[in-house]
């Protein structure tokens, strides 16, 4: 959120009151607790919306995309990141309570169905795809799958929030 402040007023929204409290304690006073499925925001309010690794957690992703379309100004930008490819589904998806992974074509179809115009779609970390796939296959074949713990259980140093 700190980085985005140079572009204008930043409002953070999270369904978790703990996350909102963390942001407020970190100096981000414009934060609110709300569900992405029904945002307490007027139509066409934002020129830039970021939703980074959130959509895959929500049961009704279409409702959320319609909400984003509603609160985004005409010619505004919505920046989304989501995990890719169902065949990469793994323990981390279960731990993080993901509902799905997307292909670019699946995500584009949903965005268009919500009335959004797509400027650009790409896969991040595409070079790591073969390594990730091979690693997961190897662990599954050799039985070396170690049970993962939630990354949210660990306490991280405060300075990491400023990177």
Language-model regions, residue ranges each:
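Short, hinge-like loop/turn segments at secondary-structure boundaries
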Residues: 28-31, 96-99, 136-140
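A C-terminal cap/extension of S-adenosyl-L-methionine-dependent methyltransferases
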Residues: 128-163
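Conserved SAM-binding loop
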Residues: 1-90, 103-108
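Short acidic/glycine-rich loop or secondary-structure boundary segments that cap or lie
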Residues: 88-90, 127-130
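Conserved S-adenosyl-L-methionine
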Residues: 116-126
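Acceptor-substrate binding/catalytic loop of class I
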Residues: 90-110, 123-124
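Residue-level detector of flexible, active-site-proximal loop/helix-junction positions
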Residues: 38, 125-128
């Amino acid at each position: 959120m700190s980085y985005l402040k140079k572009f204008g007023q930043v409002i953070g929204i999270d369904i978790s009151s703990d996350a909102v409290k963390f942001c407020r304690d970190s100096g981000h006073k414009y934060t609110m607790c709300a569900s992405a499925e029904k945002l307490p925001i007027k139509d066409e309010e934002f020129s830039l919306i970021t939703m980074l690794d959130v959509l895959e957690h929500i049961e009704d992703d279409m409702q959320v995309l319609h909400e984003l379309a509603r609160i985004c100004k005409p010619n505004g930008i919505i920046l989304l990141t989501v995990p890719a490819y169902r065949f990469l589904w793994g323990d981390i998806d279960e731990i993080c309570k993901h509902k799905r992974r997307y292909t670019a074509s699946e995500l584009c179809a949903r965005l268009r169905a919500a009335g959004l115009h797509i400027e650009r779609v790409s896969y991040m970390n595409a070079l790591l795809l073969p390594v990730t796939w091979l690693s997961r296959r190897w662990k599954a074949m050799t039985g070396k799958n170690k049970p993962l713990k939630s990354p949210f259980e660990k306490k991280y140093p405060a300075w990491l929030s400023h990177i």
